[in-house]
Design a protein with these regions (language model features):
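Structural signature of tandem-repeat unit edges
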Residues: 3-17, 27-49, 57-74, 82-96, ...
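Consensus positions within tandem repeat domains that build extended binding/scaffold surfaces
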Residues: 21-22, 77-79, 99-101, 155-157, ...
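Short acidic-glycine loop/turn motifs at beta-strand connectors
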Residues: 53-56, 131-134
Length: 281
């Protein structure tokens, strides 16, 4: 949408269908969303400044002042997309959060979850949303501390939001999902532990300032994992590395030298496409 002059909106009673995703994306001046009380399909209950679908109590569209009330059951695809929210509180009632719910929300710096929520948790000081058993980190933000005990970092968990210069993934983490740290331009160095068993495709793509990667786990680097990391110049790979996927280092314009362990028996021909790599030992 991107209507920067839009300051309020009222959804009339005759509206029966609203498209997927946040219809108010990047409407940064919009502080008020109201749905007519006589609308049979949608409401803005509890003055939440959002649009909720009545049939399943799913929040589908928001603005910068939207609050998630304890009468909302689900956060839909891209429902907060492009908003400038800083704080997220997940109440007890929410049982479903789309992995795309907070796409484009790069200014989040505080996350909490109600202790009574049966699906999600947020350990004190973590500023993250985790699965109830604490093993999967589903959503992080600029100030997240990855708790000990986390075994998986979900798809798009930190997309564009991680703000620390050194990313040190804790031991015990076994998997990093697709796009998990994509477009996190603050990251300068990434240290990936021996415990890793899988890195999803595109996991670090477009991290513009990522310069150093230390991979300690003998795994396969997935397709496009470090694609478009224009500053990447130093990559440390362990003995036992199994392979390097399609365009794993695509367009890494600063990568001139890399030492590939003899154990890596499967390296896709275009793994280093558009890289100035002149030496691959």
């Amino acid at each position: 949408c991107g209507c920067n002059s839009l300051t309020s909106i009222v959804i009339p009673k005759n509206v029966t269908k609203i498209g997927n995703g946040n219809i108010f994306t990047y409407c940064n001046s919009l502080p008020s969303i109201i749905v007519d009380n006589d609308n049979q399909n949608f409401d803005s209950r509890s003055n939440c400044n959002g649009i909720i679908r009545k049939s399943d109590s799913e929040l589908i569209a928001t603005c910068r002042t939207t609050t998630i009330g304890n009468d909302i059951n689900a956060l839909g695809d891209y429902c907060f997309d492009g908003t400038t929210i800083h704080f997220i509180h997940i109440p007890e009632s929410v049982v479903e959060i789309s992995e795309y719910a907070f796409g484009g929300c790069n200014e989040i710096d505080k996350i909490t979850v109600a202790p009574g929520n049966q699906k999600y948790t947020s350990p004190k000081g973590s500023n993250a949303i985790l699965s109830k058993d604490g093993k999967t980190l589903l959503l992080g933000c600029r100030t997240t501390v990855i708790p000990e005990g986390v075994e998986a970092i979900g798809d798009r968990a930190f997309f564009g939001r991680y703000s620390k210069t050194v990313l040190r993934i804790p031991e015990n983490v076994k998997s990093i999902g697709m796009d998990a740290f994509a477009r996190c331009n603050a990251i300068f160095e990434a240290i990936l532990p021996k415990s890793l068993q899988e890195i999803g495709g595109f996991a670090f793509q477009n991290c513009a300032n990522l310069s150093v990667v230390q991979l300690l786990a003998p795994i396969t680097i997935s397709d496009y994992t470090f694609a478009y990391c224009y500053s990447l110049s130093t990559v440390s790979l362990p003995e036992g590395l199994e392979g390097i996927g399609c365009r794993a280092f695509y367009d890494c314009k600063s990568l001139k030298h890399i030492t590939i362990p003899s154990s890596a028996i499967k390296i896709e021909k275009n793994a280093f496409e558009n890289c100035p790599v002149s030496e691959k030992e």
